[in-house]
Amino acid sequence: MHEILIKNAFVIDPVQGIHGDIMDIPIREGRIVDKVSGNCEVIDAGGNLTLPGGIDSHTHVCGTKVNFGRYMSPEDMRAGRTPRRGAMYPTSGYTVPTTYGNSYRYSRMGYTTLLEGAMAPLEARHTHEEFAATPMQDMLANTLFDGNWSLFEAVADKDIRQAAAVIGWTLSAVRGFGIKLTNPGGTEAWGFGDDLSGIDEPVPNWDITPRDIIDTSINACEFLHLPTRCIFTVTILVCLEITGLPFRPLIFHLISIQTDRPST
């Protein structure tokens, strides 16, 4: 049984009403407890802030896009190198560090939980392998659905239950936290060398629009009673004015579609 006593901690925890109190924190098996035995490991935190770990709710540290960055910049692995020290693995990479490099750097900033912003379902296994190689943080991921044909079929049929079944099965299969739409329908157009210029422009080869995809996804997630508060980060009409060109939406971006209803 692993026990730790953090002594003389300058604790800041507003949720618990603690605003800079000096106190000892007993920990057993990774959980704060009332007391520990006299044989515990003692850490003197005097002179240091002690506060709950940070949560980065949108990061890109694992998965296909990160690895493409590594493929395209092999010279980057010569930068950011650190040797192995004790239990710490060697690291490399500055622009796109290795998983261990990401983990150690986040730890230095006080982060203990990371949400990978976009996990491709077909590459979910490798994404989770990278999670396992990120030793200092709890990891979770939003799952990409913006080009999912099964979801498109449900949207075209206006069938919320079918959409919920697709989303629920996929999240369960890939162990995803929430759903992620990045340029819904636009990625389908890119496959044919085309693009979408508006939220109501039809998706090529489908009798649906990006608005339909977003609306159906929101309704399906509410139907599933996905936990946590409703957090919509929707940037669907971001326009860029370039001299001589009309306004054009740059990206349809919907992250972490969840509901404020409790899980059942």
Predicted regions and their residues:
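N-terminal metal-binding scaffold of metallo-dependent hydrolase/deaminase domains
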Residues: 1-40, 44-48
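Divalent metal-coordination and catalytic microenvironments
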Residues: 9, 25, 30, 47, ...
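Metal-associated gating/positioning segment near the N- to mid-region
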Residues: 45-130
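Hydrophobic faces of well-ordered beta-strands that scaffold small-molecule active sites
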Residues: 53-57, 114-116, 139-144, 177-181, ...
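Active-site mouth loops of central-metabolism enzymes
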Residues: 80-98, 143-164
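Catalytic or ion-translocation cores adjacent to nucleophile or general acid/base/metal-coordination motifs
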Residues: 105-107, 134-148, 168-175
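Gly/Ser/Thr-rich loops at beta-strand to alpha-helix junctions
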Residues: 112-113, 118-123, 146, 186, ...
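Histidine/acidic residue-rich metal-binding segments in metalloenzymes
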Residues: 126, 158-264
